Amino acid sequence: MAAKEVVFGNDARVKMLAGVNILANAVKVTLGPKGRNVVLDKSFGSPLITKDGVSVAKEIELEDKFENMGAQMVKEVASKANDAAGDGTTTATVLAQAIVTEGLKAVAAGMNPMDLKRGIDKAVAAAVIELKNLSQDCADSKAIAQVGTISANSDESIGEIIATAMEKVGKEGVITVEEGQALENELDVVEGMQFDRGYLSPYFINKPETGSVELDHPFVLLVDKKISNIRELLPILEGLAKTGKPLLIVAEDVEGEALATLVVNNMRGIVKVAAVKAPGFGDRRKAMLQDVAILTGGTVIAEEIGLELEKATLEDLGTAKRVVITKDNTTIIDGNGEQAQIEARVSQIKQQIEESTSDYDKEKLQERMAKLAGGVAVIKVGAATEVEMKEKKARVEDALHATRAAVEEGVVPGGGVALVRVASKIADVEVANEDQKHGVVIALRAMEAPLRQIATNAGEEASVVANTVKNGSGNYGYNAGNDTYGDMLEMGILDPTKVTRSALQFAASIAGLMITTEAMVAELPKADAPDMGGMGGMGGMGGMM
């Protein structure tokens, strides 16, 4: 085991604070509408330019082991805030730095670190309750666009495209962000349920100009097995021929004689039919077939529940307004399933998402829920260069997380105002002693830090701005974008409650632990092995006789 270096007391805290400051100072220049960019060197490819706090934090690794520990702990604050709410990473870092700086001053002055931490925790718990009281619902499109705009560093086009996407696919819908080909941002919306399986034979195509199959008001047959014998399908096909309606078959596979017969019947115009493979594999396929059944009002024909294909009737089939099948995808539009059953299925999937521990499973369940609830929107980010593309895509993703958080827990006035208002209401939290009271004061001072940093980044005097805002009331705050004061909600400067709450809780949690640190242990740097000295030159040989 390698030898370790141990640092105690104030020496340890000073080193830790130095690391905290290096990381936080690099991150906090990005805060607010007039925040600056940070350029990150990459070992390959072009440098990355970003205004995303967590991206900056993740890049920082310090040479001094003890300073690095401080930096890594603040990095943890940013990462946790990012995981919980998807935004607010810079705010969390600024709060953590403020609490640690003030806290360590108090410890150096002889106060009890544990009591300071308890005071900070009490203040934060009270602040979270006040934030919830201050919060307002974020229901309309305008508010969603404003939240998106603020999170995307005042880029209105991003806020608007996210609001449009949410309007089209609903609050539960899936919105994904991709790199686009154009210079401008684009929005693609797939309405209805789409899954990544195309037609089993090109002979089903009835729209040669688009190379797709379109079925109007079709029946939908769902089978959880391979179909290779046409005899199994005859009763359904005969019943269908009488109605004159088209049929979509979704099965594990349709092959051999069954597929050939379907193709021939389709080409002769006897029955208009198309077949696709069921989406997913194993248990996920069963679940997705059941989703389609609920969406279309049909029944999955599966032998494990005692249903046989030969005995199926038109009653077992689902129906939809329209189905479009391309080489790679099948889209079912306006299934005729019962709304109550669809809603029950959505809430069942929601429950599974909450219980799931795997990110992959969560993502797949989220997709299934979106397909049932309304559809999928894809935001294609446009930019002139790859460097700009990366920076813009990160901002769009941040804005998307922020709007989701706003829909979930509501919004509070932005620009650091919410924390200032909350601080004024919790000054008289009950505490057990003077040191705890000072812990509360540390937390209250820290709650001003984001507002002060926004003002500093805008080139204003932080103390003047902070006092002006503190003397106001309600939503009155400072708009750094155009250097004016006024009602933050009316000016459209909103922060999601969840983002502000998460930033405060994670910052206080980790900063509290740092204040109570008394010793730090790190490996000693390995001394380099000495070089082998150069071998002396061999003497010249004497003259030989």
From Swiss-Prot:
Chief location bin: cytoplasm
Cited InterPro entries: Chaperonin_Cpn60_CS, Cpn60/GroEL, Cpn60/GroEL/TCP-1, GroEL-like_apical_dom_sf, GROEL-like_equatorial_sf, TCP-1-like_intermed_sf
Localization terms from the record: Cytoplasm
GO cellular component: a single term: cytoplasm
Gene Ontology MF, one: ATP-dependent protein folding chaperone
SUPFAM superfamilies in the cross-refs: GroEL apical domain-like, GroEL equatorial domain-like, GroEL-intermediate domain like
Disulfide pairings: none
Name of one Pfam family that matches: Cpn60_TCP1
Any one Gene Ontology BP term: protein refolding
UniProt keyword terms in alphabetical order: ATP-binding, Chaperone, Cytoplasm, Isomerase, Nucleotide-binding
Family the UniProt entry places it in: Belongs to the chaperonin (HSP60) family.
Role according to the record: Together with its co-chaperonin GroES, plays an essential role in assisting protein folding. The GroEL-GroES system forms a nano-cage that allows encapsulation of the non-native substrate proteins and provides a physical environment optimized to promote and accelerate protein folding.
Protein name (record): Chaperonin GroEL
